[in-house]
Design a protein with these regions (language model features):
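Short beta-strand/loop segment that forms part of the nucleotide-sugar
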Residues: 61-70
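GT-A fold catalytic core of metal-dependent nucleotide-sugar glycosyltransferases
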Residues: 71, 113-157
């Protein structure tokens, strides 16, 4: 079974990327606040993500870095014979017939297009750029008989938890995010609970 790795990445310090984003922000001053900078700034962590995969997941065939017309510094400066199975994939390559929706700054629509990565294997591991492998892993840690092993736990919807019904602010209740996306997905398929995925590489 061939298995690839896919990493979504953005360099929020890139001035060209920032200029793309500004027209879509209601409050343009938020680009300077701490929470915004924490989410979008990068400190070369993508290099450690890639190196950890190369060192500890030797079964990985290719590594694809999905980004918006950007290239990590370690790839720009690579020497011959290094990172030969690491490839940059632009958003335009995966949005194809939906180019009119670019630029995109939300991970949800990007994730729905990962299947369009050219030459991507049927099975792959999806990483965020802040995920690192710390010891050797095997195919069987992520797939069993070709099916993905999902790590997490089943939880109640917030509205079914007494204290969260009464003490959560309206702003927090309606805030978009990873947890809210999982809750809504579970409801759409008729589940009474939702499965909260841990922040780990996701087999697909």
């Amino acid at each position: 079974m061939q298995i690839d790795a896919v990493i979504t990445w953005v360099d929020g310090k890139d001035e060209a990327h920032l200029q793309k984003m500004l027209p879509f922000l209601e409050d343009k001053s938020q680009v300077n606040n701490k929470s915004f900078r924490t989410r979008f700034d990068q400190v070369e962590e993508i290099k450690f993500t890639v190196q950890s995969i190369l060192k500890y997941a030797t079964f990985i065939r290719n590594i694809y870095i999905v980004t918006d017309n950007q290239v990590p510094n370690f790839i720009k400066n690579k020497t011959q014979g290094t990172f030969e199975n690491v490839f940059i994939v632009d958003h335009a390559d995966i949005f194809k017939e939906d180019l009119g929706f670019l630029p995109v700054f939300n991970c949800r629509p990007i994730e729905t297009k990962l299947y369009n990565i050219p030459n991507l294997s049927e099975h792959f591991l999806y990483f965020n750029d802040d995920m690192f492998l710390l010891r050797e892993v095997k195919e069987s840690d992520f797939f069993e008989e070709g099916k993905p092993i999902i790590r997490g736990n089943w939880l109640q919807f917030n509205e079914n938890i007494f204290y969260k019904r009464w003490f959560n602010s309206e702003k927090k209740k309606n805030r978009a995010g990873h947890k809210k996306a999982q809750e809504k997905s579970a409801k759409l398929v008729g589940f009474k609970k939702y499965f909260k995925f841990h922040h780990t590489p996701a087999p697909m």
